[in-house]
Amino acid sequence: MPLLRVSSCTSRQGGKGTFGGKRSFAWTTRFAFLKQGDVKKRAVLNGQKIVVVMPAYNAEKTLRRTYQEVMAQDIVDLVIVVDDASHDETVAIARTLPHVQVEVHPENRGYGGNQKTCYHLALAAGADIVVMIHPDYQYTPSLLPAMASLVASGLYPCVLGSRILGGGALRGGMPLWKYVANRFLTLVENFLLGAKLSEYHTGYRAFARSLLERLPIERNSDDFVFDNQILAQVLWLGCPIGEVTCPARYLPEASSINFRRSLRYGLGCLATALEYRWAKNFGHSRLFPELLAQ
């Protein structure tokens, strides 16, 4: 059974953030158990359009398998694959899949740049809920109904699939050094951001349209730290973030970044958290503009 964890923080002005009538309180954590079969049967999707986005780079070995499991959930209206100048057959495979919109970057724009295209295309396609999942088959698509229903019901505008909840990261093959770095970064970020997330570094996340439209994602990096910056911006709004425990699979063909880029990512995460703290004290910053917290 997936474990649900909810973390939230207060807004910059010190008031309580709200979404769908639910108040978000600082340093609040709640737990609940969800039976996956029950979630599918009673998913409160309210006729909302569910769009899954996949930022892809050299994903020919795992794209089709990920797509098939995504569509097997029977809730997805459209899949958008954005290829970031792959050198393999990712684009050719994507174009053979039904209900898939394919966008190709002629030049590599980076992981963050790819996500910007993903979210813009999803909103342009009329998505009410946007779920990002990597096409490398690291994350299980079977959690899509649970994550989408939590957003559709108005409970949480952002839901993460966490590899840390339930202790599945190491069992799934996460390298020990990455696990230790993940835990250290999360500890520091929670302190600086005033939240209680189990991790900030998952590539499995669902957003409400109303939230995505408010986030200034064009200000964010085109590199991997984009993932961290967008979550910090969600917290800046005072919005609650839900987490669902997600089994992880570290396959040989799955995408990964080397130690050097991981180090740069970690430093970028710390810089983002420090900028957030600076903005809380002095009013606003480049990533956290004044209008975001109004």
Language-model-detected regions and their locations in the chain:
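A conserved acidic beta->alpha catalytic loop
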Residues: 83-91
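Hydrophobic helical membrane-anchoring modules
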Residues: 3-9, 27-47, 192-194, 218-294
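Short, well-formed alpha-helical segments that are part of the catalytic scaffolds
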Residues: 58-72
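Acceptor/aglycone-binding surface of glycosyltransferases and processive sugar-polymer synthases
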Residues: 107-124, 141-224, 251-260, 270
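Conserved short acidic donor-positioning loop in nucleotide-sugar-dependent glycosyltransferases
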Residues: 70, 84-85, 109, 118
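Short hydrophobic beta-strand elements that form part
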Residues: 51-55, 80, 104
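Donor nucleotide-sugar binding loop of glycosyltransferases
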Residues: 59-62, 86, 140
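Short beta-strand-to-loop acidic/aromatic patch adjacent to the donor-nucleotide binding site
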Residues: 127-136
